[in-house]
């Protein structure tokens, strides 16, 4: 299964890439929202998206809105936006789950597995 990891912080992308690969998934990476939409369009077999909110060019909320126009792919937000209202807004916009930074990679992977059940 392919998992798209989207974050403008290369260190976070690399960390999540390691955990995703160690769990037997095939990671695909993007560093902003526009790149994420391109990857989703060119890889229709992506099973899940791990998505940051605050990114250049196109933020994660806009990515969620665009994806939700024609897809029900699971979206797990991993964001530094930590207030209850941030989480609620992410879920209302169309995210399936929301984890705040700093995060425990084991928790993120548990949520990935849960969303892929």
Regions found by a protein language model. Give the residues of each.
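Non-catalytic signal-transmission and effector/linker regions of two-component phosphorelay proteins
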Residues: 1-4, 116
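Conserved sequence signature across two-component system core domains
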Residues: 6-7, 30, 49, 99
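Active-site residues of response regulator receiver
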Residues: 7, 52, 79
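Two-component/phosphorelay signaling modules centered on CheY-like receiver
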Residues: 10-28
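Acidic, metal-coordinating helix/loop segments flanking the phosphotransfer/catalytic sites
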Residues: 29-48
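Receiver (REC) domain active-site loop signature in two-component systems and cognate sites
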Residues: 55
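Basic, amphipathic DNA-recognition helix from helix-turn-helix-like DNA-binding domains
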Residues: 65, 69, 74-117
């Amino acid at each position: 299964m392919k998992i798209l990891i989207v974050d403008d912080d290369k260190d976070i992308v690399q960390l999540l890439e390691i955990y995703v690969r160690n769990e037997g998934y095939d990671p695909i990476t993007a560093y902003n929202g526009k790149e994420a939409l391109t990857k989703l369009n060119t890889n229709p077999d992506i099973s899940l998206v791990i998505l940051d909110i605050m990114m250049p060019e196109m933020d994660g909320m806009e990515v969620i809105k665009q994806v939700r126009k024609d897809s029900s792919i699971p979206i797990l937000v991993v964001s530094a936006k930590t207030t209850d209202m941030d989480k609620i807004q992410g879920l209302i916009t169309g995210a399936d789950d929301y984890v705040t930074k700093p995060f425990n990679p084991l928790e993120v992977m548990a949520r990935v597995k849960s969303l892929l059940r």
